Regions:
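A short acidic/basic microdomain associated with nuclease active sites
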Residues: 320-338, 344-347
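Short His-Asn-centered micro-motif
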Residues: 330, 416-419
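Extended, hydrophobic alpha-helical segments in both membrane/secreted and soluble proteins
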Residues: 315, 340-344, 355
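Catalytic cores of nucleic-acid endonucleases
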Residues: 359-414
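Short acidic, S/G/P-rich loop/turn micro-motifs used as interaction or catalytic elements
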Residues: 361-362, 420-423
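Active-site beta-strand-loop-beta-strand hairpin of nuclease catalytic cores
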Residues: 346-366
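Acidic, metal-dependent phosphodiester-chemistry machinery of nucleic-acid enzymes
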Residues: 1-309, 313, 317, 321-322, ...
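Beta-sheet entry/capping signal
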Residues: 326, 343, 350-354, 410-414
């Protein structure tokens, strides 16, 4: 079964015919002009229109067209943020659909100044920014949501966790994990079916009995209000808090920075109903990434360490799905066994894949591709690459403790990250990482979840051919999957099956 056929749709957006976009700006637009164009309109008028289009054009096939590309979710997300964070009600006009089109056209006319100046490294930085802006909205809804349960509830750690101990979701989120993700499924589906809106009053309507039978209405209301919802004032405060901690981006690249809707994707106080400008942010909030940020805010590095332990075991669970592999855990070696190898060795007939796991995600400097990006990449991924080289050397030398790992076949490596570093393998970006003794690639949890479902060829042979092909240097692991047959991912399916409404019942709120 192909990956596209396995995709779960949480709701089907209504068909919507967009206004055709004439050439609104035959010139470059700077960030200040873009923000001022958005600020012409009352947020309570503009943002609900953004939500209507966000629901209608949430899927790639809907906005990957000539006359609807201006309504891509990353464009709408920035229009909504500019209105909510910088907008005002004083002396402003109501917005129309045509006004939204002009705001989106202004956004698309924003240049990349570094690229224009043809500075050294400008092309690589441009792709870093572009990937962080756009590819976040092109991930699998099924995998991102199912991974939450599969990682946090269905993966057994090998040691006692410091903060993520039994009952931690209730302490952190105020509810069980399935209720937290269930609320996201409900909000996402409602947004797509109800023009980007949700009304809390719907929870007590008779047509919601199928929903509230699984999760009580009062629980859903509490979760939505406490974990997903914010007013304009609260969103502004979140923006200011993050910028106070990470710094204010260069004005030319402000649009690539933090968006408070990623933390609180449901807006209250604009209308009689709740407004959901960008449905994709609902999924992000309920994914392991969203929970990571909540856990870090409350518990700090203790939660990060627990997540690292869980993610390492989770990667092992994914590798165990392969039918033709022997998976070996990390090896303690050296004086008093104080040194550790890579986290996993996947032994195939054709090769050995060394796997180092990093529960990390791109930070603000990487998303902005600013002067700190190279240092950040080295800090987050450099040790993982060194681990591949060190462990490969130990295998070759037959060091005590490594006897189970065959030294008679080629070795390749994977650095598996929690979240995608989309362009990290291209030569410009990978030049910031240490040299490695074996061919390797950085891949995300999502890439691995898809890789292990390949059913028409050994994954070991697939990786060996892909990573040693000089014509594919810098290609992503996901590019190696094109044209191959895929089965189901049992770990992802088990995670999804733990949620309420997994059969996707029809609920359309007040419509």
């Amino acid at each position: 079964m192909s990956r596209s056929n396995r995709r779960v749709r949480l709701g089907q957006a209504r068909q919507y015919q967009p206004l055709r976009s004439p050439l609104r700006y035959g010139r470059r637009v700077d960030d200040q002009e873009f923000v001022q164009r958005v600020r012409r309109h009352v947020p309570a008028s503009l943002v609900p229109i953004v939500a209507r289009y966000g629901a209608a054009f949430s899927e790639q096939e809907q906005y990957f067209k000539r006359h609807s590309a201006q309504y891509a979710p990353w464009v709408l997300a920035e229009v909504a943020r500019a209105s909510l964070v910088y907008g005002t009600d004083f002396n402003r006009k109501p917005a129309t659909d045509d006004d939204l089109l002009s705001c989106c056209a202004a956004y698309q006319s924003l240049p990349d100044r570094e690229l224009e100046r043809d500075e050294e490294g400008a092309v690589g930085n441009f792709f870093l920014r572009l990937a962080g802006e756009q590819l976040t909205f092109q991930q699998s809804v099924l995998n991102d949501l199912a991974r939450t349960a599969a990682l946090f509830e269905q993966t057994t750690p090998r040691k006692v966790l410091r903060t993520a101990s039994p009952g931690w979701p209730e302490r952190l989120l105020g509810c069980r994990l399935k209720e937290y993700v269930g609320a996201a499924i409900l909000l996402h589906t409602s947004a797509l079916k109800n023009a980007g809106t949700f009304d809390l009053k719907w929870l007590t309507q008779p047509n919601f009995e199928e929903v509230t039978r699984e999760v009580p209405a009062d629980v859903l209301r509490l979760v939505i209000e406490k974990q997903y919802m914010a007013t304009r004032e609260e969103l502004r405060a979140i923006q200011q808090e993050v910028e106070g901690r990470t710094g204010v981006p260069n004005r030319d690249y402000r649009r690539f920075g933090f968006n408070p809707l990623s933390r609180r994707p449901v807006v209250a106080g604009l209308a009689d109903t709740l407004v959901i400008p960008v449905p994709g942010f609902i999924v992000r909030r309920a994914s392991p990434l969203g929970i990571y940020y909540s856990g870090m805010a409350q518990w700090g590095s203790g939660f990060s360490a627990d997540l690292g332990e869980l993610f390492e075991v989770y990667v092992g669970r994914q590798l165990d799905l392969l039918p033709d592999v022997r998976v070996l855990p990390e090896i303690a070696f050296g004086r008093k066994k104080g040194a550790l190898s890579v986290d996993w060795f996947a032994v195939f007939d054709d090769c050995v894949v060394l796997v180092e796991v990093k529960s990390t995600r791109p930070t603000e400097p990487i998303r902005l591709a600013d002067g700190r990006a190279g240092e950040e990449l080295r800090r987050m991924l450099g040790h993982a690459v060194d681990q591949l080289s060190t462990s490969a050397g130990r295998v070759r030398s037959g060091e005590p403790g490594f006897e189970e790992v065959p030294s008679d076949r080629p070795m390749v490596g994977l650095v598996v990250t929690m979240e995608p570093f989309h362009t990290v393998n291209i030569p410009f970006t990978s030049s910031h990482l240490p040299q490695c003794d074996i061919p390797f690639a950085v891949c995300s949890a999502l890439d691995l979840e898809h890789l292990v479902t390949v059913s028409d060829v050994s994954v070991g042979r697939l990786l060996l051919d892909h990573l040693t092909d000089p014509n594919k240097k810098g290609w992503s692991v996901s590019s190696a999957l094109t044209g191959h047959a895929h089965g189901r991912n049992a770990v992802i399916d088990e995670g999804w099956a733990s949620y309420p409404w997994k059969e996707q019942p029809e609920f359309t709120g007040g419509v």
